[in-house]
Amino acid sequence: MKILSLRLKNLNSLKGEWKIDFTREPFASNGLFAITGPTGAGKTTLLDAICLALYHETPRLSNVSQSQNDLMTRDTAECLAEVEFEVKGEAYRAFWSQNRARNQPDGNLQVPRVELARCADGKILADKVKDKLELTATLTGLDYGRFTRSMLLSQGQFAAFLNAKPKERAELLEELTGTEIYGQISAMVFEQHKSARTELEKLQAQASGVTLLTPEQVQSLTASLQVLTDEEKQLITAQQQEQQSLNWLTRQDELQQEASRRQQALQQALAEEEKAQPQLAALSLAQPARNLRPHWERIAEHSAALAHIRQQIEEVNTRLQSTMALRASIRHHAAKQSAELQQQQQSLNTWLQEHDRFRQWNNEPAGWRAQFSQQTSDREHLRQWQQQLTHAEQKLNALAAITLTLTADEVATALAQHAEQRPLRQHLVALHGQIVPQQKRLAQLQVAIQNVTQEQTQRNAALNEMRQRYKEKTQQLADVKTICEQEARIKTLEAQRAQLQAGQPCPLCGSTSHPAVEAYQALEPGVNQSRLLALENEVKKLGEEGATLRGQLDAITKQLQRDENEAQSLRQDEQALTQQWQAVTASLNITLQPLDDIQPWLDAQDEHERQLRLLSQRHELQGQIAAHNQQIIQYQQQIEQRQQLLLTTLTGYALTLPQEDEEESWLATRQQEAQSWQQRQNELTALQNRIQQLTPILETLPQSDELPHCEETVVLENWRQVHEQCLALHSQQQTLQQQDVLAAQSLQKAQAQFDTALQASVFDDQQAFLAALMDEQTLTQLEQLKQNLENQRRQAQTLVTQTAETLAQHQQHRPDDGLALTVTVEQIQQELAQTHQKLRENTTSQGEIRQQLKQDADNRQQQQTLMQQIAQMTQQVEDWGYLNSLIGSKEGDKFRKFAQGLTLDNLVHLANQQLTRLHGRYLLQRKASEALEVEVVDTWQADAVRDTRTLSGGESFLVSLALALALSDLVSHKTRIDSLFLDEGFGTLDSETLDTALDALDALNASGKTIGVISHVEAMKERIPVQIKVKKINGLGYSKLESTFAVK
């Protein structure tokens, strides 16, 4: 994984938006750069931004959400962090941002917005928090914990690891490398073994508690069940006969009751028909009157229509008179306003003619303002250039004397050559510090390989002997365990053996002979159980010792392989480094050898470069002084020319040039005069528009309308609507008068038609017709009543006949079971209830017997199943017991410590590789007496072994940095790490130790990694030319980067 660029906005003290592109110069050609600035300026904020963009949290602040954000710069409303990174040649962009409501600093925090996109095509791969975190971890192979331990390194943390106690070091190893799974496995094996033993004891207790029926009990219950079954069949037959008789009698009673009800219904229907005769008589006259109803209703409709039309005529006349009066008022007011407006128009025309000169400079103030502003700006620039000229002359006079006499071009060429050779010089220093330590380390490895090979042979012999002993003891344990299990199984059947009687069959095997009962009762399981416990302890101890020995042998084998690989790697590295040395010296055109002292040559190069830089500064200052003089002359000429041009322009308008610093008030006066003239012009245009609006009113509305006696306030804008309303009402008045004539004619015609129909009817006059006339609803009800009465009488008569026939047919089908003629329904129901009760008692007895038989069968099946489960569980207990003896423990310590030891061996091996690259003097190794203790080997002091607590600051830094890089490789074993950021406190190191640390960083840079170091130490600025400078802004509490990193 490689960080390509970083963009951030408003984070902590870094206010504003900034972007650092690590793919561009100067980062592209310099893999080592420093992040410098005073304490508290915000250097670590850059690393916080990287973590925030990728994982939404930082090492200093783990909670950034909608409810809390302490990262956002105060008095701002938004913040963001964006990182572009590369994994396996593919570039991705991780983005995080948050803003406040209404985009105001006091607004509530909103939900953060996140994105993970592919840079090649801009496709968004994830935009939800959980999805983005999971996809980032999948792509990079690093979650937040591994990222902050592999790409963001802090020396202080690993110094704590170096000097920690074994228990603390074990916890740190487990946290950093994820080996906690081994402790969980160890504890799980222990718990599984314990659980299996508990389950076996439960099964054995269940098997001893199962009770079975004797054969005699089973035979007796089976015979009783057969008797009850025969009795049940007889009761069911009797129940069916009794139910049949009860059904026949019940049906006969129902038919007799129904015949009585239907005879009563017939009598009631005849009575209701007799009662309705007066209403039916009125119906005979109402039906002829129905035929005349349409003629009568037509007369009523025409009379109502005529009355409605005449009412409308009256309403329209009233509205027409009112609207015409309103139209006359509107015309009167329009004429009056037109006269007043024309008088105002004449007054405005007079004022505009008198002040016409204001119009001439209506558009000039903007140009005058620009010229006045330019004059002020030029005067300020003139003063600045004069100050810069004085400052440059002072700097030139303060420069130290130099002996070089080169032109500016020659100086630039020489400095460029030094810049090109600087990486080569740094590379030469790194190579010089690597070749000699590698030669010494190679000799040490040869001796170490011989010693480890001899130790490997000895451990193999010891392991083979221990395996033979373990095999013998395991066989003895299996034999004793079989005996103990047999004794335990015999012991669990003690309750059943106590129930055995001579001559009685065994419930399990059926035998009537029990010869071994007394022998079983005389068993003493304690002796074999003691042997079993002793053998289990001995096998467990041999297993643990064998596992430890195997682990030691594996560690020795791996150490041997690592030493051989390291020796081969060192030989290849030595050859490669020698070739690089020759290439570098050839490029520098020097003849130095790897073992020569190169410091005098380096000092001479530095002094020559310093002289060149001083001479370059002198040439640069001389050029600045000439340029400043030219600028001063140019600005003086511009000020004089613009002053003359302004004076000429204002004279043409009869205006005088304002005094210096009074331009704004002078411009304000001119602007007010121009605005005053324009305001009067706008008022004149508005008056003319208003007069034009009144003209159509006066031309359209007639003068013949009579004015109302009392004038009212009118709205002139509605004049057209009022006029159109007058015309519409007049047209409506004429239409209604025509409708009135037609309605009167229709009424006369309807009256004549009714009179003719009345003469042809059964009625003598109109009064007789009205007396017989009924409303349609009443007439329909009477007709429906007559029809209902007739239908009700016929239906009742039919039902009486049908019921009599049904009763006669039922009596012909009397049951043939000897049913007496005098028996009642109650007697049959009583007999049927007795039969039901006997059946219930029979069924209950059968159920009890069947349940006893089923329970006995279930118990026998349960006992057989339990014996099978006991056998299976016994095997599981043995399997888990063996595994528990090897790696199991209650707290998970046994397997965890073994895994942590292997992890520490791997970490020490990787750290030694890093130490060889950084500085060939020191190596790390595990203490033989302590499981997780490490010590330092000083190869320059005859491989003297030292405790890590005795290291100096510089030595501790080198070892801690090697451990940090090794742990980075260990944590990120599936992901290549090409970028490292060291948040290290170099300020506590002395000058000599600081030089050692910087040499180590140079050597690390030569390995191809991009390294960023946070520091505020001045010596860092000289040794690391590429820097990201974080500067405080005095008095504001904010910081900033250089302008090249600002996003505009």
From Swiss-Prot:
Keyword list, A-Z: ATP-binding, Coiled coil, DNA recombination, DNA replication, Endonuclease, Exonuclease, Hydrolase, Nuclease, Nucleotide-binding
A single GO molecular function term of this UniProt record: single-stranded DNA endodeoxyribonuclease activity
Segments forming a coiled coil: 191-402, 438-502, 528-648, 671-695, 770-880
Matches recorded under Gene3D superfamilies: P-loop containing nucleotide triphosphate hydrolases
SUPFAM superfamilies: P-loop containing nucleoside triphosphate hydrolases
GO BP term, pick one: double-strand break repair
Binding site for ATP: G37, P38, T39, G40, A41, G42, K43, T44
Classification via Pfam families: AAA_23, SbcC_Walker_B
Signal peptide start and end residues: none
Any one annotated GO CC term: DNA repair complex
Family: Belongs to the SMC family. SbcC subfamily.
Its biological purpose: SbcCD cleaves DNA hairpin structures. These structures can inhibit DNA replication and are intermediates in certain DNA recombination reactions. The complex acts as a 3'->5' double strand exonuclease that can open hairpins. It also has a 5' single-strand endonuclease activity.
Subunit record text: Heterodimer of SbcC and SbcD.
Name of the protein: Nuclease SbcCD subunit C
